[in-house]
Curated annotation (Swiss-Prot):
InterPro entries, per database record: SVWC_dom (IPR029277)
GO cellular component, one term: extracellular region
Major location category of this protein: secreted
Tissue: Expressed by the venom gland.
Superkingdom, taxonomy of origin: Eukaryota
Tagged with keyword Disulfide bond: yes
Signal peptide: 1-26
Protein name: U-scoloptoxin(16)-Sm3a
An MF annotation (GO) of this entry: toxin activity
Subcellular location(s) of the protein: Secreted
Keyword Ribosomal protein carried by entry: no
Record's comment on post-translational modification: Contains 4 disulfide bonds.
Family, per entry: Belongs to the scoloptoxin-16 family.
């Protein structure tokens, strides 16, 4: 039995929104970094202890220094590109620090 078209439309919008939420959380990259005295030299040029978390509020990112048996790495989490349907619109983030500074999407469900 097929769903009525309005119900199908609502279900599709919610599925798209769920996919959007998954994409928003996917902005993590890991880069090998220089080390100094057992610490990471971050993208900011500063020395950071292993497991230390720091933020760059200018580009809305979170950084973490990690060390495993292969070397030192900086994990960088940033906002990701958002793809959304035409009945939705982009809204500014609610804060100044990652992840609250990332844009979001709001949708009109008729």
């Amino acid at each position: 039995m097929a769903l009525p078209s309005t119900l199908s439309s609502i279900v599709l919008r919610w599925v798209l929104f769920a996919i959007f939420l998954l994409l928003v959380e996917a902005g993590e990259r890991q880069y090998r970094t220089e080390s100094r005295d057992g610490k990471c030299v971050g993208e900011d040029g500063q020395v950071h202890a292993v497991t230390e978390i720091w933020y760059n509020d200018n580009d809305c990112s979170e950084h973490t220094c990690v060390n495993d048996h292969t070397g030192y790495y900086e994990i960088i989490r940033r906002c990701t590109l958002i793809v959304y349907p035409p009945e939705c619109r982009l809204v500014n983030g609610t804060g100044t620090r990652y992840p609250k500074c990332c844009c979001g999407v709001t949708c009109e469900l008729n």
